[in-house]
Every structure is written in structure tokens, then in C-alpha cells.
Amino acid sequence: MGVTALRELIPSKCKKTLELKSLSNKSVALDAYNTLYQFLAAIRGEDGRPLMDSKGRVTSHLSGLFYRTINMLENGIKVAYVFDGAPPKLKTREIERRQKLKQEAEKKYEEAVRRGDVEEARKYAQMSAKLTKEMVEEAKRLLEAMGVPWVQAPSEGEAQAAYMAAKGDVWASASQDYDSLLFGSPRLVRNLAVSGRRKLPNKNVYVEVKPEEITLKCVLEELGITREQLVAIAVLIGTDYTPGVKGVGPKTALRYVKSYGDLERVLTALGVDDKELYLEAYNFFLNPQVTDDYELVWRRPDPQKIIEILVYEHDFNEERVRKAIERLMKAWKEKLSTKQSTLDMFFKKR
């Protein structure tokens, strides 16, 4: 979910619309779970059901991962995917909330199907999207076959991606959520994996979605706050780890934080009972669990392995996959395989 309400505070001058080609030769750490969920929600049939193979296994995530990654590589974007590890205990409440919402959505989906309401069925089918361990492992296998690096985070993927960006190992972190800024990423790119012509939910309307760059330094300077205060604001309005203080929205939180200086004083002034929860979440954003155990190497794709995974195992159309592989190989040769770019892209962690 992330801190969606935080977008209200992002100054317009700190947002920059990008063309995919403008990211050529830039490396980006992409939040894998966030991206795969987008594919699961968006890539569906007319009835709202996800794409499946002959054995009934969901393949929407693989389709999105394969074709969208090729699109990014064709534009010279050196993308690496960062996968979540064990969620922090702080997130237990949020995970339970999401599971309950998915269960409710599944029931409403079945009811809509019985009524013959296609639009409602599609809406609730998207809301009930699930990402299993098996699906995650399939995604990793496909990325390896494509020669695209992936990183296993010890905890939150966004925290790891932000760490990699802060170290300068990648140019930016990419996610639909704003948590990357809270975790200290100097640069966040949104809409990277979903750019292009997209249909609005429940409407027969299409819009052009373009990548958007948000710079942390600009946000802090324009709001006149520190990163610590930005985290305090987020914790007050609600995150994956805190429910948010009742009656406190983004602008009110900004005013309180600037007035009192830090989170603990604001919590005391507001008479918040569960102060420890908010302070624990605050400290987690500032000191998340991350690792240096990763390599960023864009290797030569393995066409036969890709065909085995997509065509033989999951019934993808062989002709279409082979044509996409041709694009992938062309992108690798032209954008990723030169000696100089290999030097630029290789970061071996000690």
C-alpha cells in the first residue's frame, strides 16, 4: 500500500515527467513485489480473471515481467528487480488487513459473476490478486533466463532499493509507492513498469502514463523539513506499519512536525496512547534491514531457457515469445553488451 497520502505534500516542481528513452544507460532498482502486483491486477481477461496456463496456474505476472522488462531494456534502462524478504513484525496488522480485503473481494467477485456483471467482476478480481511464493520463484527464474539481475532483500524491497540508490549503485529506485523517499532514496521513479497507453479502472477511457521522477532533496527543501521530519509526517498520517493518528492528514501533520520539531513531541502533544508503535515505525524507516550481498550484472540472455519456462511450462504462444526474444537479444547487444557498459554495470559487493 505504501504512504499514498504523502503525494499531497509533494511539490509539483519536485516532479518531473520523463520519457522512457531519457532513462537510457541509467540503472534502476525496481520494487519487484510492487511491480508484480501491478501486472497481476492489470493483465487480465474480459471477465477479470488473470491469465492462466493449461494447468490453471496464473501467468499474468510472467507475461508482464517478460514483455515490460524487454520494453525497458530496449530503451536502454538497466533495470534490476529487488524482492522482499521477511516482513517486519510491524507489518503484521497491515498484512492481516490486506488478506481480509482480498477475501472480501473474492466473495464480491463470485457474486458479480453470478449476476453477470462483467465490470464489477473485473474490479473485484483485480482487488483479489495474490502473489504466491511459487509465483515469486518463477519470476526469479525468468529474470535469470533473461540475463536481468535480481536482488534478495533481507526485509522490505523498497528499503533495499533505496539503499542501493543512496550508495550510488543505481541511479534511482522505482516503485508506485512513496516509501522509497522515506527509506532515503535520493531519487524515486514512478510508473516505470506501467508506462504507455493504459485503460482507467471501470471506465472505457485510456490515458497516456509516463514515468515520473521525484527528487528527495527537492521535496525536503521545498517543504523546509529534514528527512527525519518527512518520516515523522508519514508515520502520523499512516503507513504500512502505523494506522495513522485520527484526524491528522498530510497538511496537518506537516504543520505539527514543523511546530514541535520531532515525532515524539507531536505524539505527546496529541495524546497518542500507542507512542511506541509510532516511534518503532519511525526508527524502522530510518534504519531498515538491508544487505550489501548483491551483484548487478546484466548477462547474456538464454533464449532456450526462456522458451522452456514460458512456452513449454506455461503455454505461452511460441511465435510471440520468439519474436520478443529477438527484441531482447537485439537490446542486449546494442544497449548492454559493450565493454564499457559492462564495466559501468558491474558492482561486486564486498
UniProtKB/Swiss-Prot annotation:
Task: Name the CDD domains for this protein.
Answer: H3TH_FEN1-Arc, PIN_FEN1
* Cofactor note as given: Binds 2 magnesium ions per subunit. They probably participate in the reaction catalyzed by the enzyme. May bind an additional third magnesium ion after substrate binding.
Q: Which PROSITE patterns match?
A: XPG_1
Q: Where is this region: I-domain?
A: 120-261
EC number of this enzyme = 3.1.-.-
Please give one Gene Ontology molecular function term for this protein.
Answer: magnesium ion binding
Q: Tell me which Pfam families the record gives.
A: XPG_I (PF00867), XPG_N (PF00752)
Function summary = Structure-specific nuclease with 5'-flap endonuclease and 5'-3' exonuclease activities involved in DNA replication and repair. During DNA replication, cleaves the 5'-overhanging flap structure that is generated by displacement synthesis when DNA polymerase encounters the 5'-end of a downstream Okazaki fragment. Binds the unpaired 3'-DNA end and kinks the DNA to facilitate 5' cleavage specificity. Cleaves one nucleotide into the double-stranded DNA from the junction in flap DNA, leaving a nick for ligation. Also involved in the base excision repair (BER) pathway.
Give the UniProt family note.
Answer: Belongs to the XPG/RAD2 endonuclease family. FEN1 subfamily.
Name by which UniProt lists this protein: Flap endonuclease 1
Q: Which organism is it from?
A: Ignicoccus hospitalis (strain KIN4/I / DSM 18386 / JCM 14125)
